[in-house]
């Protein structure tokens, strides 16, 4: 692993494996794990709302998203932190490594169904509705198209590997990371 202060963001849609990966990274490297989804869920619980109710509430109250984002940006000032959230890669502009995890919606629905003890069909509908709401909200609030993956350094389809396989890929990326500058760029010589 490169020496120094690393800030890594891990983003992805529901059921893509972001939390699993972040837990493994935090455990292996001793990184602090900042989880935007947990912040959001805690805020819903504080207001006595389900996640779905709070999602709709947040659409009308942009201060909710801004508070979650503020906490992520604040966390990025620390060293050796992995920040998990759908917009983490967008919010933490100077992250050393920005990762996006993806998987087909059917695979993600199966994972969410197992995790939440609901049917795959229920999970599919919840995910589809939530993603539509989030996409609209992020576009209106920040002008961010969540489907634009151009800002990410590493994009992984987690349906192709086990959680340990995904971790191995990311570990290799971290262990060979050149956080100073752009390892692949051709620097122009200064002309004087």
From Swiss-Prot:
Pfam families: Cytidylate_kin2 (PF13189). It catalyses: CMP + ATP = CDP + ADP; dCMP + ATP = dCDP + ADP. One of its GO terms (cellular component) is cytoplasm. Keywords: ATP-binding, Cytoplasm, Kinase, Nucleotide-binding, Transferase. Its EC number is 2.7.4.25. GO terms for molecular function: ATP binding; CMP kinase activity; dCMP kinase activity. It is found in: Cytoplasm. GO terms for biological process: pyrimidine nucleotide metabolic process. Gene3D superfamilies: P-loop containing nucleotide triphosphate hydrolases. The keyword Kinase applies. It is an enzyme of class 2 (transferase). ATP binds at residues 12-20. CDD domains: CMPK. Belongs to the cytidylate kinase family. Type 2 subfamily. This is Cytidylate kinase. It comes from Pyrococcus furiosus (strain ATCC 43587 / DSM 3638 / JCM 8422 / Vc1). The lineage of its organism: Archaea, Methanobacteriati, Methanobacteriota, Thermococci, Thermococcales.
């Amino acid at each position: 692993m490169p020496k120094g202060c690393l800030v890594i963001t891990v983003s992805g849609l529901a059921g893509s494996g972001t939390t699993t990966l972040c837990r493994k990274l935090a455990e292996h490297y001793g990184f602090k794990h900042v989880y935007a989804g947990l912040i959001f869920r805690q805020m819903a619980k504080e207001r006595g709302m389900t996640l779905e109710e709070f999602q709709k509430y947040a659409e009308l109250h942009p201060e909710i998203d801004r508070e979650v984002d503020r906490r992520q940006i604040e966390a990025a000032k620390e060293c050796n932190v992995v920040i998990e959230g759908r917009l983490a890669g967008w919010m933490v502009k100077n992250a050393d490594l920005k990762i996006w995890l993806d998987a087909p919606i059917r695979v993600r629905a199966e994972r969410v169904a197992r995790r939440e003890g609901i049917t795959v069909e229920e999970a599919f509908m919840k995910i589809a509705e939530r993603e539509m709401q989030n996409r609209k909200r992020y576009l209106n609030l920040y002008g961010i198209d969540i489907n634009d993956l151009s800002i990410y350094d590493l994009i992984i389809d987690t349906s192709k590997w086990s959680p340990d396989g995904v971790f191995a890929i990311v570990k290799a990326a971290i262990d060979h990371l050149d956080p100073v500058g752009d390892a692949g760029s051709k620097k122009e010589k200064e002309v004087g």
